[in-house]
């Protein structure tokens, strides 16, 4: 068609067009039934063709006055005496090629560059680095370095590795992490729980093959765990961490802390060789108590050190609160208490042992090699990797949970965003590079991260200065490390690990918030103490997964009713009352029981799902819908079966006593079911099949087609799935000759300025309008919600009474030159009339077509209905 013909075609009257071009009708766009209460003066219709060739129905109205409900003398505003047009809107359903094009192939090069750049967050903030940041990072780095050196050696002792391996892990963790980090506070290095897991892994592998060296096992474990963690981050799978709740993490962390403390008491008292520290925690405690008579001089070093550590801690905390001027001094004193106690203990040990170096009276650390003597390409054994395969899940879980939970907590406290996927990459890269230094697995440390944050660190570059302190210790202080008492190191470990135990108040809080999660916490601690740390971790993870699946399989869906509410802004006579209907659970959970929640319109069920509609909960939702429908509605035809033998065995006949009088069933027929999908983010094949089965069962019960309406669908793929299963429109297109369309105005409203409008602090009504106080009886007796139909009724209407003498309550744009032409557009696609914006729109649509159908006679549907399957795209029975 040429351009001139297109112009003529556009301006031509549809009646003058050729028969093959003039539309006979537009499906669904017809006047309402004659017995329907009119909201506006009868409109006139004309079909035309838009510029794009789309058939559009234009609706013309005469001007109508709108009055406040119950007060016909006060006009709120008047519609301009101009045309109001409502066009079409067809929303395309998503497709797999379209998704791939949009999310994968669209701007692929730009996406790839952005992804590669995101792997190195240091590129974003390093160009803006300044001297002020440098000063704070230097102070924080040195402070953390003074803590990480004694802790690194102590935790290496927990891991049953030589002390230098703890220093290697400490150096690599703080030096490499800053390149990939999204958290400025986290300090990566040896930690108590991961060191304990490493010791268990070493013991298990050496039990299979004693030829493996402990350091080799620790390095290989770091390689494998780091590779898995880094891979999860590169694939953006960090969300899997969210499947384990906080109580589960707290459970096995508490169990691990108890195990570590129990294992260090024997070293504190000087008889470590008499206690098997790799046994279950309760056995370690029993053996420790049994060997108390074998206590040695080491106990003097250990117990005194432990007492001083706690004394300094609580004294400094008290002085910080009392003398705020010197809180910086007290803070540094508190932070350096572990380093100072080791220095003092080492000096005393040197005085005691310097003349008896070959046979010291106390247990001392011994020789620590200087520098990075073990640095190099590691030798990885395939057999060792195979032996470690069964130990990897526990190691990876501990690495993930400890680090991410610490990073997120400091991100919340200090107001910056932590990216879990990038943190996994950072942790994985740190452990992979640490293999070349013969480091064992490292992750985020809560105690050192807290010190880092309180020291005023500004960027992750503070880890470089911490690494410098570790290097200085490795090259200059290893000679002094020889005389460090093991009892003092045990005191430092017990003091550090004690904070990992969840206090009883937190346990009580778990119980008050979520009793089931509190039980998971208790079970994790119990299994960790009486079995093993590995079993405690598995117990916490499995119970958390079971609880999650249970909640998905048994969603707390609710059937909705209508509650009329009003907002009272002031107590004076100038207050404004806003009355509206809302849909709330019929059981009134969480509401005042004195309120009256009305049932939805007769024959209509409104159900709100609280979870995604997937295979675990499909059967449960099906049972809830069918059970409720058969309770509140009657069967469409009680005599559907001609003979008793025709009735299925699972469909018992109604029972009545002999000679009992016939009682008329006043329950309504089932007309429609409205499903509120506002909380549904996904629906799978099983869920759709459950809906198809539910519809089939209820249609046999009702004796006619039951409409399934869906509201608040927030995912295009859900619409695609429902449409493929035959939902979204009536299956018998000839039966429903009218429907309503939710339309929205393209012009702003100017009647009432609300607090949401700029420059206003309260609602201001036009000066010509008197505002009445709230009338409770009027609110209760008010009628059905606004009916906004395709006849062009304005979407700004508030409510419509079922009494013909009452007027429409609401407001319209005032007379203004800018409102010379009002255009209204469908809010959602008009292709699928059973998809709605909200529950109110769905109820309006059903009432518009059913509520006045007094001669409605349902047709009889036998039990020989053809099986419906979701393979039928039209959903026909």
Swiss-Prot record:
The chain crosses the membrane at residues 133-153, 161-181, 186-206, 221-241, 243-263, 292-312, 329-349, 384-404, 424-444, 461-481, 484-504, 518-538, 543-563. PROSITE patterns: SLC26A, STAS. It is found in: Membrane. High affinity uptake of sulfate into the cell. It comes from Schizosaccharomyces pombe (strain 972 / ATCC 24843). Pfam families: STAS, Sulfate_transp. GO terms for biological process: chloride transmembrane transport; sulfate import across plasma membrane; sulfate transmembrane transport. Residues 801-821 have a biased composition (Basic and acidic residues). It comes from the Eukaryota. Its main location: membrane. Belongs to the SLC26A/SulP transporter (TC 2.A.53) family. Residues 594-747 form the STAS domain. One of its GO terms (cellular component) is plasma membrane. The keyword DNA damage does not apply. GO terms for molecular function: secondary active sulfate transmembrane transporter activity; sulfate transmembrane transporter activity. SUPFAM superfamilies: SpoIIaa-like. It is a multi-pass membrane protein. Keywords: Membrane, Transmembrane, Transmembrane helix, Transport. This is Probable sulfate permease C3H7.02. Residues 643-663, 793-821 are annotated as: Disordered. The keyword Repeat does not apply.
């Amino acid at each position: 068609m040429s351009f001139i013909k297109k112009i003529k075609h556009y301006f031509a009257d549809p009646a003058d067009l050729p028969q093959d071009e003039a539309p006979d009708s537009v499906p669904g766009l017809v006047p309402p039934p004659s017995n329907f209460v009119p909201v506006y003066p009868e409109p006139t219709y004309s079909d035309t063709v838009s510029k794009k060739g789309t058939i559009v129905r234009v609706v013309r109205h005469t001007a109508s006055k709108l009055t406040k409900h119950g007060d016909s003398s006060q006009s709120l505003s008047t519609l301009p005496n101009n045309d109001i047009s409502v066009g079409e809107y067809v929303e395309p359903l998503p497709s797999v090629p379209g998704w791939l094009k949009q999310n994968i192939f669209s701007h692929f090069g730009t996406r790839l560059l952005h992804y590669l750049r995101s792997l190195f967050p240091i590129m974003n903030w390093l160009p803006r680095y300044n001297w002020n940041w440098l000063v704070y990072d230097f102070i924080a780095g040195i402070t953390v370095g003074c803590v990480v050196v004694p802790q690194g050696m102590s935790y290496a002792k927990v891991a049953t590795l030589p002390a230098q391996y703890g220093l290697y892990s400490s150096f690599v963790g703080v030096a490499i992490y800053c390149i990939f980090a999204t958290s400025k506070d986290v300090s990566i290095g040896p930690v108590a729980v991961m060191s304990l897991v490493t010791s268990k892994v070493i013991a298990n592998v050496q039990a299979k093959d004693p030829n493996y060296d402990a350091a080799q096992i620790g390095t290989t474990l770091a390689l494998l765990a780091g590779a898995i963690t880094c891979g999860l981050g590169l694939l953006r799978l960090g969300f899997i961490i969210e499947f384990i709740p906080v109580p589960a993490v707290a459970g096995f962390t508490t169990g691990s802390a108890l195990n570590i403390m129990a294992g260090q008491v024997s070293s504190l008292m000087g008889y470590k060789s008499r206690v098997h520290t790799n046994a279950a925690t309760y056995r370690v405690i029993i053996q420790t108590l049994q060997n108390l008579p074998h206590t040695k001089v080491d106990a003097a070093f250990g117990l005194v050190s432990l007492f001083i550590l706690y004394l300094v801690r609580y004294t400094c905390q008290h002085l910080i609160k009392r003398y705020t001027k010197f809180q910086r001094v007290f803070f540094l004193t508190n932070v350096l208490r572990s380093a100072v106690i080791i220095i003092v203990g080492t000096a005393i040990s040197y005085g005691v042992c310097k003349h008896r170096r070959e046979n010291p009276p106390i247990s001392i650390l011994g020789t620590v090699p200087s520098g990075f003597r073990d640095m190099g390409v590691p030798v990885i054994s395939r057999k060792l990797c195979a032996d470690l395969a069964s130990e990897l899940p526990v190691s990876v879980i501990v690495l993930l949970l400890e680090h991410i939970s610490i990073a997120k907590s400091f991100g919340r406290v200090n107001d910056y965003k932590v990216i879990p996927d990038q943190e996994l990459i950072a942790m994985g890269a740190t452990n992979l590079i640490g293999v070349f230094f013969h480091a064992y697995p490292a992750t985020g440390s809560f105690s050192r991260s807290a010190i880092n944050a309180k020291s005023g660190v500004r960027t992750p570059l503070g880890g470089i200065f911490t690494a410098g302190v570790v290097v200085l210790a490795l090259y200059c202080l290893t000679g002094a490390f020889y005389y460090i008492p093991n009892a003092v190191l045990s005191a430092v470990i017990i003091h550090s690990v004690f904070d990992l135990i969840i206090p009883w108040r937190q346990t009580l809080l778990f119980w008050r918030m979520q009793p089931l999660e509190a039980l998971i916490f208790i079970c994790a601690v119990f299994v960790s103490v009486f079995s093993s740390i590995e079993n405690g971790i598995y117990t916490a993870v499995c119970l958390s997964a079971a609880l999650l699946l249970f909640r998905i399989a048994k969603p707390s869906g609710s059937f909705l009713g209508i509650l009329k509410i009003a907002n009272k802004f002031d107590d004076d006579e100038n207050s404004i009352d806003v009355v509206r209907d809302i849909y709330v659970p019929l059981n009134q959970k969480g509401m005042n029981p004195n309120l009256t929640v009305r049932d939805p319109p007769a024959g209509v069920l409104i159900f709100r799902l609280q979870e995604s509609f997937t295979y675990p909960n499909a059967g449960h939702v099906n049972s809830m819908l069918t059970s409720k429908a058969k309770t509140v509605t009657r069967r469409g035809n009680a005599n559907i079966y001609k003979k008793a033998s025709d009735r299925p065995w699972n469909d018992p006949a109604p029972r009545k006593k002999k000679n009992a009088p016939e009682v008329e069933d006043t329950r309504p027929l089932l007309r429609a079911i409205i499903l509120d999908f506002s909380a549904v983010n996904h629906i799978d094949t099983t869920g759709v099949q459950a809906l198809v089965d539910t519809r089939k069962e209820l249609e046999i019960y009702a004796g006619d087609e039951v409409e399934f309406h869906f509201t608040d669908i927030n995912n295009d793929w859900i619409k695609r799935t429902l449409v493929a299963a035959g939902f979204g429109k009536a299956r018998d297109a000839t039966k429903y000759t009218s429907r309503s369309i939710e339309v929205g105005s393209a012009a702003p409203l100017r009647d009432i300025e609300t607090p949401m409008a700029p420059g206003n602090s309260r609602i201001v009504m036009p000066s010509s309008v008197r505002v009445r106080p709230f009338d409770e009886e009027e609110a209760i007796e008010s009628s059905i919600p606004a009916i906004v139909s395709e006849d062009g009724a304005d979407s700004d209407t508030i409510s419509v009474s079922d009494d013909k003498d009452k007027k429409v309550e609401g407001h319209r744009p005032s007379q203004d030159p800018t409102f010379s032409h009002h255009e209204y557009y469908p809010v959602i696609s008009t292709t699928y009339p059973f998809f709605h914006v909200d529950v109110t729109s769905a109820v309006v649509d059903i009432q518009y077509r059913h509520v006045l159908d007094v001669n409605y006679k349902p047709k009889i549907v036998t039990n020989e209905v053809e099986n419906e399957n979701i393979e039928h795209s039209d959903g026909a029975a």
